[in-house]
């Protein structure tokens, strides 16, 4: 978390929380949802400003209830999740392929899930900021779930051995010479299984 953010929390400790104004879409884009977007159930405007995107990513936090928020100075801006708290991309690097979130953090995968709509979710550990209480934060590697970006589905299919299941696909996939499980899941089970709140409220 940015030092200036921590200082502002000490200086202004009782700023009201903000809900519904910021969203994370299925492609890992932050979206600003003004009053018109909220009233008309629109996705909102994609934030394209590079510095603002980086600022949000550095100060992206999860609380004990499973609500994700952006610590914007002294104010917590809770984030509506279109899918999952993290969106994964398969990216090349000098060490080979990497799984990276929208916040540029690495995912250490332990498996994957496939739902009835053909979505793939990467299960694994992500180094993330956790809010405890009274402006106390810590970082830890926590198991979570990340929707795989749809541009990487073809690449994933090349790594996977699939078998048809009742509602989706199961099987395994190869990641860095390891065979990891691919299990079926229903999309409406994702949030409860991984203990996050997609539409946070006060």
Model-derived segments and spans:
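Long alpha-helical, hydrophobic tracts
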Residues: 1-54
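Residue-level detector of beta-strand structural context in well-folded domains
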Residues: 20, 68, 110-111
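Surface loops and adjacent helix of pleckstrin homology
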Residues: 27, 35, 73, 81-83, ...
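Generic recognition of long tandem-repeat/solenoid scaffolds
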Residues: 31-32, 69-71, 99, 119-124
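Short, well-structured hydrophobic secondary-structure segments
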Residues: 32, 40-85
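Charge-rich alpha-helical segments
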Residues: 76-88, 95, 130, 137-140
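Surface-exposed beta-loop interaction hotspot
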Residues: 84-116
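Glycine-rich, aromatic-bearing surface loops/beta-hairpins
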Residues: 107-109, 113-202
């Amino acid at each position: 978390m940015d030092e200036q953010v921590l200082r502002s929390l000490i200086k202004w400790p009782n700023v009201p929380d903000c809900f519904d104004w910021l969203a994370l879409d299925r492609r890992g884009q932050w979206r600003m949802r003004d009053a018109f977007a909220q009233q008309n159930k629109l996705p909102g405007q994609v934030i394209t400003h590079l510095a603002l995107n980086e600022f949000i990513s550095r100060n992206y936090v999860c609380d004990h209830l499973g609500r994700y928020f952006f610590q914007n100075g002294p104010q917590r801006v809770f984030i509506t999740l279109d899918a999952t708290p993290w969106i994964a991309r398969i990216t090349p690097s000098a060490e080979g392929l990497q799984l990276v979130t929208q916040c540029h953090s690495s995912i250490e995968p332990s498996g994957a899930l496939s739902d009835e709509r053909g979505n793939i979710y990467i299960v694994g550990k992500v180094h993330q900021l956790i809010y405890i209480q009274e402006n106390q934060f810590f970082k830890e590697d926590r198991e979570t779930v990340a929707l795989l970006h749809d541009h990487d589905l073809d690449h994933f299919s090349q790594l996977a051995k699939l078998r048809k299941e009742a509602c989706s696909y199961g099987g395994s996939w190869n990641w860095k010479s390891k065979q990891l499980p691919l299990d079926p899941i229903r999309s409406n089970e994702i949030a409860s299984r991984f203990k996050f709140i997609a539409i946070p409220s006060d």
